[in-house]
């Protein structure tokens, strides 16, 4: 299960669809409608004051991106969106997720990997490598609309692979 903290605009079609499906599964877990995945680390950040509102707001963000692309994700499966709700995520987590996504995209959708922040095509091989912008230029990684960014390392709930 991967519930991306980065903005869904970075995801390719397969990634966006997988995020939607895994988000719906996460919703069932958080609403106690299934017995599996209860201790999944990706769900830790959604165990806040109102887990239902948090996951529904997350999924509405995924739905918004899908709608922007012309996909038809069924918003009727969700509860109410709470645009005022914010969960913090560290910039280290966003950077980790962007690199994790980059590695996935290099295998299944190299042309999409070129669109990620900090990507630079290799002129000889046509592959995409991470571009080190140096200390004078910081790469901005947009978070999913549910998340507000704070400075810090990769989140403790992340299983680093």
State where each predicted segment sits.
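Short beta-strand
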Residues: 35-37
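Sequence termini and other peripheral, non-core segments
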Residues: 1-16, 22-33, 47-161
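Conserved, mostly hydrophobic/aromatic
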Residues: 40
């Amino acid at each position: 299960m991967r519930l991306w903290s980065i903005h869904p605009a970075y995801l390719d079609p397969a990634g966006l669809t997988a995020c939607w499906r895994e988000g719906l599964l996460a919703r069932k877990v958080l609403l106690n409608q299934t017995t599996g995945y209860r201790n999944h680390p990706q769900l830790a950040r959604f165990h806040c004051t109102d887990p239902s509102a948090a996951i529904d707001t997350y999924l509405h963000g995924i739905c918004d991106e899908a709608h922007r692309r012309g996909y038809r994700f069924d918003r009727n499966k969700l509860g109410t969106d709470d645009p005022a709700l914010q969960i913090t995520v560290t910039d280290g987590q966003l950077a980790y997720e962007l690199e994790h996504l980059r590695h996935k995209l290099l295998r299944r959708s190299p042309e999409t990997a070129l669109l990620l922040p900090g990507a630079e095509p290799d002129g000889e091989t046509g592959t995409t490598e991470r571009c080190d912008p140096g200390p004078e230029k910081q790469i901005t990684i947009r978070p999913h609309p549910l998340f507000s960014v704070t400075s810090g390392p990769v989140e403790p709930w992340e299983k680093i692979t």
